[in-house]
Regions:
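A short, surface-exposed alpha-helical micro-motif characterized by mixed small hydrophobic
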Residues: 208-210
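Pre-NBD coupling/linker segments of ABC/ABC-like ATPases
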Residues: 3-39, 230-234, 238-241
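Conserved ABC ATPase "signature" C-loop
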Residues: 220-221, 236
Length: 241
């Protein structure tokens, strides 16, 4: 389902902004280092099988977001092989495709189409989506009138009802109140149990151990460990002490 082989990703190294005088005085260094790059990912390789749920952990700057952006297709690898088979549904920035002046009902259709469904398919699911979101009385109001919690509930409801083949999740299990968070977690577990391949990036080790069947630990752009959630999370927490 997901095959990654010797994946490298680089970005231009950040440079300090210099005034004209500093630029002239440091010109020899600038010319010497003009090809400097920052390697966010350094030759990582792994495979994820259909129906597998893999957690990605690591400190900020470890390469998690870069990897997720490549898996999603919004960034390209500098070198290496990225082979992904299946429709990808992101649970990253919920409601990114929502239009504030349109109603919740209209945004269900638009967002559902953006996530790969036909209008007919999403119309069939709309009642179920509205019920799951628990905002039925506001569904025909413009989403700009929604609270942040209502907005996120509706966006999450749309995403989990679009029959994804590959689910890419980044820290979104804090949607709504505590009750809705539990409901959200159960919805994701149901998708996983139904064979949806899932990649879950999180700083919550409890959520990782609860949902994932395997964990990859990234550190400075390389894979530090890959295996059983309890073992890998244990190693990660031990090093952080």
């Amino acid at each position: 389902m997901i095959h990654i082989d010797n994946l490298w990703k680089s970005y231009p190294a950040r440079r300090e902004k210099l005034g004209f005088k500093e630029f002239v005085l440091n010109l020899h260094k600038i010319l010497k280092n003009r090809d400097d790059v920052f390697w966010a990912l350094k030759g990582i390789s792994f495979d994820i099988k259909k129906g597998e749920c893999v957690g990605i952990i690591g400190k900020n700057g470890a390469g998690k977001s870069t990897l997720l952006s490549i898996l999603l297709g919004v960034a390209n690898a500098t070198k290496g092989i990225v082979d992904i088979k299946g429709r990808r549904t992101p649970l990253l920035e919920l409601g990114a495709g929502f239009h504030p002046d349109l109603s919740g009902r209209e945004n269900i259709i638009i967002n559902g189409i953006l996530l790969g469904n036909t209008k007919k398919e999403i119309m069939k699911k709309s009642d179920e989506i509205i019920a799951f979101s628990e905002i039925a009385e506001f569904i025909d109001m413009p989403v700009r009138t929604y609270s942040n919690g209502m907005y996120m509930r509706l966006a999450f409801a749309v995403a989990v009802h679009t029959e994804p083949e590959i689910l890419l999740i980044d820290e979104i299990l804090s949607v709504g109140d505590e009750f809705f968070q539990v409901k959200s977690g159960e919805a994701i577990k149901k998708l996983i149990n139904n064979g949806v391949t899932t990649v879950f990036v999180s700083h919550s080790m409890d959520a990782i151990k609860s949902i994932c069947s395997r964990v990859i630990w990234l550190e400075h752009g390389v894979i530090k460990a890959d295996g059983d959630p309890a073992d890998v999370v244990g190693q990660y927490l031990e090093k952080g002490r």
